[in-house]
Amino acid sequence: DHGFIGEEDDPDPSTASLRWMVDPLDGTSNYVHGYPAYCVSVALAYRDEVLAGAIYDPVADECFTATRGGGARLENRVLCTTNPLQLSDALVAVSFPPHVDRESLAVTDFLSIIPHVHSVRRTGSTAINLAYLAAGRLDGFWVRRIACWDVAAGLLIAAEAGAAIVPCRHLSDPGDASLPRHVSLDRPAFVAAANKKIANGLHDLLAG
C-alpha cells in the first residue's frame, strides 16, 4: 500500500508506510512567465525516511537521482559537491515566497547573508537549487519555510553528493551537519552547503 502527498493533492489520510512525495511543477511562476527554471520532483519515503529521489529539469533535459546510501547522479555521472575554502567564495541560493515585505524574516536573512558570500541567487525553484548544489553549480542554499514535497528529493540528492545539512530548528546549536534522517511534513527549514564549514557559516549568520 502506497500513499501520496503533494502540492496538487488533498492531504492523504492513509497510514501507508511507503509514501510518494510529488511536486509535478516546482517553479510554477517561472513556468507561467516562460522563465527557464522549473522541474518535476519525486521522492519515495518509508515512513519519514527518504529512500529515493529524482528531479527532472525539462528545459535542460537533465535528470538528477539518488538512493539512500547509493550516491547521487546526473544521468550516468556521479555527483559531488564543490569544496569552497571560504564563505566569501561561495555562490549560494535562497528560496522565499513572493510578495515579502521589508520587515519580513526573509529580507532580514538575505541582508544578513549577502555581505558575507560571493553572491546570492533566487531561482524560484527549490528543487533545482538543491540539484545544483549536488552538481557543484551552487555552494550553499537556505530556506526557512517550505513544503516537504519541494525538498524531499533534493535533500537526498544533495546529501548523497556530499552536502552538509543543518536543520533551522537547531539554529542555537548547529551540531553535526548531516542529512536529517526524517523529512518533516510541517514545512521543513534548513541550511544546505557543499561542506560543513560553509553550512555552519551560513547557519551562524542566520542565527545572529
For each feature predicted by the language model, list its residue ranges.
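Flexible, acidic active-site loops/lids enriched in D/E/S/T/G that coordinate Mg2+ and/or position polar
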Residues: 1-47, 54
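Short, Asp-centered acidic motifs that coordinate Mg2+ and/or phosphate
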Residues: 3, 52, 91, 139-140
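Short secondary-structure boundary segments
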Residues: 8, 96, 144-146, 168-171
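Conserved acidic residues
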Residues: 17-19, 51, 118, 139
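Buried hydrophobic positions in well-ordered alpha/beta secondary-structure cores of metabolic enzymes
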Residues: 27-28, 92, 133, 158
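Acidic beta-strand-loop-alpha-helix segment within the catalytic core
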Residues: 42-131, 170-173, 177-208
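Hydrophobic residues within well-ordered alpha-helices
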Residues: 131-134, 152-160
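Alpha-to-beta junction loops
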Residues: 135-140, 162-164
